[in-house]
Amino acid sequence: DLHLGYNIGCRHMEKMVEKINAQNPDLVVVAGDIFDNEYEALENPDRLAAILRGIQSKYGVYACYGNHDIEEKILAGFTFGGKEKKESTIEMDSFLEDAGFTLLRDEYVLIDHSFYLYGRPDYERPGRGIDERKDPQEITADMDLSLPVLVIDHEPRELQELADAGVDADLCGHTHDGQLFPGNLTIKLLWENAYGYLRKENMHNIVTSGVGLFGPNMRVGTKSEICDIMIHFK
C-alpha cells in the first residue's frame, strides 16, 4: 500500500527505494493501493516514476491493483464518491509502466522457469475492463503445480480457497494493521489474518501494514513497513 497522492510523495518514495535496494531483493511486489484514489494528486508524476524506476531487483517489480486504485476525488483524506462503479484509469496504467512496474490484472507470469506469480484484481473494485475476477481454482487451472505458485492479492480474502487451489504463498495488504489505535485491535475481528503471518494448510499468507496511509496522515500503535520475505523452494 503506497497510497501515492496528497500524503505520500517523492520524499517518501526516495526513502522507500533506498530501503528496498538495501535488501538486495530477487523480486519486489506491491499488493495494491498504489494510488490514493486521485491521480491528479500525485506530486510530480514524472519524478515519482523516475524514483520508482530506481528499485533494483533480479526479477523485476510486479503489482496488482487495490480498492483505492480508482479515480475518485478526495477531501480531507477521505473519499466522498457516489455508488456508481469506479475504475482505474489509463493514466494510472501508464504511470506504472513508466515506473518500471509490471501490472498483473488477473494473469500470471512464469519467472525464470522456476515459479509462478499471479496478480489478482481487487475483490471489491476489480478495475477497468474486468467485471468479475477469476476464482482461485481458475487462476491455477493451467499451471504446472509442481512449481511454486505465489499470488499477490490486495485484500486477504479467500484464504482457504486459495490453499485448496494449490497456491503456496498469498501476499496481501489493505488492512494497514488498523493504522490508528484502537483499530489495530479491532481489525482482528474483521479478517482471518489482519496482519502478519498465517499458515493455511500448505499455503503461507502474509499481510503487510504497508508503506502509505489512508485518511489522516498519521499512525498510532502501528508502523509503516517494507516486508522482507525469505522464501525457500523445495
Model region roles, listed by residue range:
Residues L2-K234:
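Soluble catalytic domains of enzymes that build or remodel membrane lipids, polysaccharides, and related
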